[in-house]
């Protein structure tokens, strides 16, 4: 399913042994209002079939994505070998610790260093900082550009971690805009992983994330983004939309 939202895939065999496959937007919690003359473009679906087992099915599917859906210079070329600092450091790092990890990895033939969670805002553990997409210069002294330049000078590419849809209640973003989160009226929110989910139905939320991420990505020679999503959607209710349009959110 060429779509990142809630979807349904079904396969059934009827009484005369006909097999039917159906895939599309999941009907649960979905509705979409169309005024006269408006059009709704449903997401595309890619299906793969093989009579030669799962291996052939998987190979056919991979080829379809590489040849027709992937874009950019890595569409058909080998991806760089990368190292990620997450389990080596968790949130406890500074630019020197990151540089040393990259330096040792370079000696082993690794081609890219990816800086994971903890580089932004007041992010000392998983209870704070999400949503504040600006560099923590107590950890990355001199800013992101200086660190990336050092990594590049070793002959390595640089990547960075984001989790754009999530926000911590202990963050500058949440304190400024508590109404930007999905939340069901008069109910306590689900704080899975100490996170809430931003309401992407709001244009101001999308604009904030776009501008904040662009500012980071434009500040240095960043060639890769690890785009994480660590919790499921819940409390799917937008204060921005009226009651009869809540089915457009999920």
Predicted feature locations:
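Hydrophobic faces of well-ordered beta-strands that scaffold small-molecule active sites
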Residues: 42, 79-85, 111-115, 158-162, ...
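Short, solvent-exposed beta-strand-terminating loops
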Residues: 2-4, 168-170, 176, 228
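Aromatic- and glycine-enriched glycan-recognition loops and surfaces
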Residues: 89-175, 182, 207-211
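Catalytic cores of glycan-processing enzymes that make or break glycosidic bonds
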Residues: 1, 17, 29-30, 34, ...
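N-terminal accessory beta-strand-rich subdomains and adjacent acidic, glycine-rich linkers
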Residues: 1-65
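Flexible hinge/switch segments at interdomain interfaces of large molecular machines
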Residues: 72-77, 121-122, 182-189
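Active-site neighborhood of glycoside hydrolase catalytic domains
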Residues: 136-154, 174-250
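Long, charged amphipathic helices and adjacent flexible linkers at domain junctions
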Residues: 61-81
């Amino acid at each position: 399913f060429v779509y990142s939202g809630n979807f349904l895939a079904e396969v059934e065999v009827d009484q005369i042994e006909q097999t039917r496959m159906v895939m599309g937007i999941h009907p649960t919690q979905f509705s979409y209002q169309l005024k006269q003359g408006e059009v709704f473009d449903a997401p595309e679906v890619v299906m793969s079939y093989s009579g030669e087992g799962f291996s052939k099915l998987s190979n056919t599917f991979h080829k379809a994505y590489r040849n027709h859906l992937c874009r950019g210079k890595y569409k058909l070329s080998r991806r760089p070998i990368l190292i990620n600092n997450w389990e080596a450091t968790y949130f406890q790092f500074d630019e020197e610790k990151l540089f040393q990890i990259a330096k040792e990895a370079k000696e082993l033939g690794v081609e890219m260093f990816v800086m994971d969670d903890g580089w932004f805002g007041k992010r000392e553990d998983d209870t704070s900082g999400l949503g504040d997409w600006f560099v923590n210069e107590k950890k990355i002294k001199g800013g992101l550009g200086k660190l990336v330049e050092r990594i590049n000078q070793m002959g390595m590419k640089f990547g960075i971690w984001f989790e754009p849809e999530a926000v911590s209640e202990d963050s500058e973003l949440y304190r400024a805009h508590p109404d930007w989160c999905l939340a069901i009226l008069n109910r306590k929110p689900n704080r899975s992983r100490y996170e809430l989910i931003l309401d992407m139905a709001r244009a101001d939320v999308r604009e904030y994330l776009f501008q904040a991420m662009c500012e980071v990505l434009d500040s240095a020679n960043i060639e890769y983004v690890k785009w994480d999503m660590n919790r499921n959607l819940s409390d799917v209710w937008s204060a921005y939309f009226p009651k009869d349009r809540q089915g457009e959110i999920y």
